[in-house]
UniProtKB/Swiss-Prot annotation:
Keywords: Cytoplasm, DNA-binding, DNA-directed RNA polymerase, Metal-binding, Nucleotidyltransferase, Transcription, Transferase, Zinc. GO terms for cellular component: cytoplasm; DNA-directed RNA polymerase complex. The keyword Nucleotidyltransferase applies. The gene is rpo2C. This is DNA-directed RNA polymerase subunit Rpo2C. It comes from Methanococcus vannielii (strain ATCC 35089 / DSM 1224 / JCM 13029 / OCM 148 / SB).
Amino acid sequence: MEKQANVYVNGKLIDTSKDPENLVKSLRIQRRSGKLSPNTSISFNEESNDIHISTDGGRAVRPLVVVENGFSKLTNELLEKVNNNELTFEYLVKTGVIEFLDAEEEENARIAMYNDEITFENTHVEIDPLVILGIGAGVAPYPEHNSAPRITMAAAMGKQSLGIPMANIKWRMDTRGHLLHYPQVPLVRTKHQEILGFDKRPAGQNFVVAVMSYEGYNMEDAFVINKASLERGLGRSTFFRSYESFEKRYPGGQLDKFEVPEKGVRGYRAEEAYRNLGDDGLIDLESEVRSGDVILGKTSPPRFLEEQEITLQTKSQRRDTSVTIRHGEEGVVDLVILSETKEGNRLGKVRVRDLRVPEFGDKFASRHGQKGVIGLVVPQEDLPFTEDGVIPDLIINPHAIPSRMTIGQVLEMIGGKVGSLECRRVDGTIFSGEGEWALRHALENYGFTHSGKETMYDGKTGRKLECEIFVGVAYYQKLHHLVAGKIHARSRGPIQVLTRQPTEGRAREGGLRFGEMERDVLVAHGAALLLKERLLDESDPHEDYVCAKCGEIAIFDYKRGMKFCPVCGESEDIQDNRKIPPVKIAYAFKLLLDELKSMGIDPKLKLKDRA
């Protein structure tokens, strides 16, 4: 007796079938005729003899053209009607011309890439091979020539690139934003870019790129960049940051007020900080501001009711709650808006702009996951030049190409070179872009070698370089990881309330973490004094009295000028340090002792004289 196939719906066994193949076939016919949801998945596993039907959400599905008897159901007649907007995509799905398959059902499908590759064995054909890529990977040219991790990285970094993010950026008040000054459309384009409208909002610029070493300054993915190109506006962008505050209402009819705080107000800053404020407390347009400057002057009533009763709400007891420029930032006031909240309170918003010219440490990336930072800015006259006098904008390291297998970038550079010579844009769409040899022959027609390599001369000595240099045009993106937003140092600053260690992070004027691995290096070197300085003296030093008899933390009675042990009762005058001596420990260690005590563990310290 033939074994019956189990039928599962969303993983739950509901029935069995004697003829599973016919059941699956009839269900698919019903789906294509619109009787079942187009998002239903119907798959048959011959090995386990199971039918799996999925109708639940969260499954990734993709559209494919149905093939019947060796012919695509998407005929030229239908295509023409779609192009003329007579038919919609939804109509093709409803009539079974196109159907959605998930990963499970795709195991039962034989999918052809192109119509002319269809055989009688095929069940589906791709709408177009380029649909396998999403938005991020689709804008990269020749991705089929790159390794998969680089495509993933390129897709991720494309989201971080600077350009013109939206049409109304002139009046937007986003918390932070970037604007590239001279975005260009890429010379090597893809069909994805046309579909997305990328050319209307480009996010990068075409760089003349040379692949060569330059005095070691482009090691480890660093770039050498042309100073004259930067002065002409290459990679130049503006960073925007918005600040806001509103006049809050308090119980008892009190409220905040936008104004220039008077000197008697609690928390008054230096007079210099208020220098750009108008009488209404709002800053003047085009004022230059730096870290700590007030841009929205505001005062608030006292925080506690007792203060009001004692002072009878005198003006001097109001608090300064002004908004200041963030630590480590500066710029020019770009936009000031005075509006109202939903509750009718006055709302002030200020946008500050800061010009960001590319500098050491700024991050750039091609569309092939080749990311790096600027390692050296070189005057144009010192850079190598070609026989035609072309000086590259960017010099990248030859070691960046072979191990990463980003041949797509090599093809893009040749394509960009051809496009600039022929004053046209080259198609680099996946699987259907202009071929390698077509581009090579085009270069030869213009007198260049088909490899893209050129003879170059040293800008400093004028001597001919011994080997030919690969030169081309590549589209590079400036990423929002700019060194001006990350550079940070601290000598002294605020500490945390709980641990008394320096705060963390650039925004809080924090210290630089000296971690376990850094500690191990000093231990290995035997640098004991340096260890003590980093981990104790410059972090959270704390002096406490410890009972020499029982090892408990002692108590200091300030009024009586005595110290005593709460456990064994030992005591002595403040001048004596024999029974209860002062011990220097890290405050974090003292905190640990206190937390152990809170859990019922009583740690004791054993003391001995210094050697």
